[in-house]
Amino acid sequence: MTTEKGEQLRQQLIAAVVKKRAAIARAHEIVVRLLEPGIPEPEFLSLLCEIGPPNYSDIVDEREINKLCGYPLCSTVLENVPKQKYSISASKNKVYDITERKKFCSGYCFKASEYIKSQVPTSPLWLRDRETRPSFQLLPRNT
């Protein structure tokens, strides 16, 4: 009887590992897909539930490396990217770290990307089938 339980537990563990690997591989496929310019909005929103925040950060970083705006729905090519890490505002007497901001073509794209990133589920990818599918909202254009 203990060997039956042991074998059953072993099979469950193997199934869980296979499921985990498949979810991670699917997330990687989505990252690669979202590196391309011209992603349709409905497709983008449908793919978000299958990735996690680290995957989304990878998308932004890889798009920047490819000289594309980090926001997956934007196809703008990045030109004249500032080389400095900080921006100094003399009028506000502040220093701003622009490391993340310079991955985007505009303030809107930066805000929209951060808005989406805040909605991406943080639960493990392989356990998402037990959750209700979230509904993602895009940042309106006039903000």
Curated annotation (Swiss-Prot):
Zinc fingers typed RTR1-type, residue spans: 46-129
Keyword Transport: no
Source species of the chain: Drosophila melanogaster
Top class in the EC scheme: hydrolase
Catalytic activity: O-phospho-L-seryl-[protein] + H2O = L-seryl-[protein] + phosphate; O-phospho-L-threonyl-[protein] + H2O = L-threonyl-[protein] + phosphate
Enzyme Commission code(s) on record: 3.1.3.16
Name of the featured protein: Putative RNA polymerase II subunit B1 CTD phosphatase RPAP2 homolog
Family matches, as InterPro entries: Rtr1/RPAP2, Rtr1/RPAP2_dom, Rtr1/RPAP2_sf
UniProt-listed PROSITE patterns: ZF_RTR1
